[in-house]
Structure formats: C-alpha cells, structure tokens
Amino acid sequence: MAVLFTIHSDLRYEIVRKVFEGGMGIIYEAEQHGARNFVKRVAIKVIRQSYANQKQFIENFIGEAKLVADLIHTNIVQTYHLGEAKGIYYIAMELIRGVNLEQFADQLRDKQRVLPPELAVFIASRVCRGLAYAHAKLDKDGKPLGIVHRDVSFKNIMIAFEGDVKLMDFGIAKAKGFLIDNEGEVVAGKADYMSPEQANFQITDRRSDIFSVGVVLANLLLGRNIFKGLNAEESRKNVMTLPLPDFRKLDPRIDDRLNEILHRTLARDLAKRYPDADEVLHDLEHYIYHSGYGPTNETLGKMIRELFGLNTKLAAADAKGSTRLLERAARSTQTLKAKDAAGAASSTRVTRSIKVRPK
C-alpha cells in the first residue's frame, strides 16, 4: 500500500506506578502525553534487567509486540506501540482496570463466595471468543498465522471492573514468522494449565489452547486446579496421566451437559477434543443462553465490584479514581501468606520454561 504522508512524533510516557512484576518482565501504569494536555493511561511492559541482554528474550519480546499489534478484539488486551529507550525495549498496551483470575479466585475464597456456574461458563466463553479470533488470524498475504497462545491460565486472563474479560500475554505464543520457536525441545507454559502435548514435548496446534480453556473452566467451577501437584514436574505428569473425574460428583451444580463440555475440552485424544475455539464457544454460549437470557459483562462487573468492595460510581470515575480502584483491589488480594505464595509458585510454574527434553 502506497504511503500518503508520514507523521513524525515523539511519544512521551510518564510512569505512575508498578502494576505487576513477574519472572521475566515488569508492567507499569503510565500516562501517555500528547498535544494540548492530552493524557491517556496505558500499561508499559518491559523486560526485567536481568534478561535485557539475552538475545532470545529480546527477540521474543519484539515478536510478541509485532504479533499482537494486529490482534484487535474486545477479549484480547490491545497493543499500541513497541518502543526503545536507552537500549531497553518496551511495549505500550491497553491498561485494564481490574484483576486477573488468580486474584479473583483468591478473593472468592477469602470472602467464602462461590462463583455461579453460569458466570464461570461466561468467562470461559469470552476467552474462547478471543482465542477463536487469534487462531483464525491471517498474515498480509492471506495465509493462516497459526497462532497458538500456549499460556492460557488464570494469571493471563483479566476481568475489568466493568466486566470485560481479556486474554493477555502472548509472550510464549507461537506463530509463523514472528517468534523464536523451539517447540519439541523445551516445555513452555504453566505446568498445571498446559496441554498434554505441551507437557510431552510435542508440536501443538490450536487444540492445545482448548485444553487450557478446559482447565480454566474446571478451576473456576471447582475452586481448585485438578492437575496441580506438589511441584511443577508432578503437575506436568498429572496433565498427561491423571484420570479425568466425573465432574458431576465433585460439584452437584455441574450437570450432564457441562460435564460433557469439560470432558471434551480436556480430552487427551486430540480426535476427541474440540477441533476449534468456535465450537467450544458455541456449546458454552448455548449452555448459558439456551433459555433466552444469561450472564452479561454487566452481571460479571457488578459481582467483581461487590467482591472487592468497590463503589460502582467510583469505578466509572476518572483516571485517578480508577487508579485508586486498582490500588484497593491490589491490597484486597494480598491475602496469601508468603509460604503459600511460594508453594503456589513452585507447584504451578514451568513458566517460559527452559526445561529441555531429556536426551
């Protein structure tokens, strides 16, 4: 496409606070400033200093930004810009004023609340909407990109205070021509959310993400991850070998149809698993809307604001008010004891793993 003209602009970001610090990167809340006092709140993601000089991490970071830049969907966190400052690459992204599913689940547990099955299914259906879009994405020549997220998990699913469900972090996704891919040689992902083919050093396709959606849905319904072991290696083995339960016996709220959906998403035999996210989405939405009315973003948003003790009017306030909401939510989710948090980390993560296939 011919270029009509070029606009040169110096973007300026002012970092407001640290939102999250993970093993590989840090996410900040920032203000993007423009002409005539224009201000937009964004999230800024940077590589941790200890990894900033490692070529593979840098290339994957850049690849993630390029890949997600054109994934514009209401259920995927949007990427605005890839930049470099003083030799450090950063990604400017949509700022989600809300919590991830891990924080959400912790708060449910703390408040001794149970998530209604219909809302659990609603959340999973929105994740499937985002995945269906990503899986179907084509390159500029009209050829499938073959995107597989490979890290669908509680920490990578956000719920905004308004009730929007957002899939984030394509940092270990695979796609043709975008990211360094040594699949089959290393295990990448969270051990108790990855698919059996991931856990077994096999090549994955979009059905791998469907298995992970099944883990997310089961976790939301039961309040626990059935594959979680004492450590990452045990979790990985559970994903490959643990017999699937009759979910109806674990929770009487799970009926025959929902039990069937869970077993089909979690099928180890790829021929028996759902072939694509669209088909999962169809069954999930039929489950919650077959009677004519079911959960909405507003339903979920109301629950999450009540759960975190957030004033509805404040949730719709200006940027500063929304920042206070984030801070209050963060404080209310700091309920795990240090030893529990450490145990959770050790038992779930082969995250962005460098676990090499045995020779």
Task: Give names to the regions the model predicted.
Residues 129-147:
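Protein kinase catalytic-loop region centered on the HRD/HxD motif
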Residues 192-336, 356:
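C-terminal lobe helix-coil module of Hanks-type protein kinase domains
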